[in-house]
């Protein structure tokens, strides 16, 4: 049972203008990546991710097409709750890969809903402070990174 959500006023740090990139192999695009900044004043373990939903151009991205990268390791979203040894520092981006065959060059409306459990704020057993790390922004697809 979570408490109310805490949201700091720094959405521009979550989805920066250069965050959306094409992900290509020799045969062509296989998807895209999205870099996500942490809108909080402390780092958190990756297992603190309670909910991650991505919508691009009003189309929800299915969970099975997403991999999350942190510290050089890849995780399906279903395994994030077990990634308690992986720490997400505030100055490092979380990278999401979406393997959907790619998207067109140009601007895209990106809506991220990312809810985090604040592991430093446990009010009672199973009752945590929650952080709303969500953001919406129009991003232009960049070349491969």
Model-identified regions with their sequence ranges:
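Terminal leader/tail segments of proteins
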Residues: 1-145
């Amino acid at each position: 049972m979570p408490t109310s959500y805490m949201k700091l006023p720094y959405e521009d740090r979550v989805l920066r203008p250069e965050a959306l990139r094409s992900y290509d192999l020799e045969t062509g695009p296989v998807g895209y990546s999205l870099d996500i900044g942490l809108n909080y004043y402390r780092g958190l373990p990756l297992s603190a991710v309670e909910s991650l939903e991505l919508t691009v151009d009003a189309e929800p991205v299915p969970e099975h097409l997403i991999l999350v990268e942190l510290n050089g390791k890849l995780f399906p979203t279903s395994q994030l709750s077990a990634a308690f040894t992986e720490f997400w520092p505030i100055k490092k981006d979380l990278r999401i890969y979406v393997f959907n065959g790619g998207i067109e060059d140009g601007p895209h409306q990106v809506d991220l809903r990312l809810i985090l459990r604040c592991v430093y704020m446990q009010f009672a057993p199973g009752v945590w402070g929650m952080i709303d790390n969500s953001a919406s922004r129009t991003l232009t697809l960049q070349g491969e990174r």
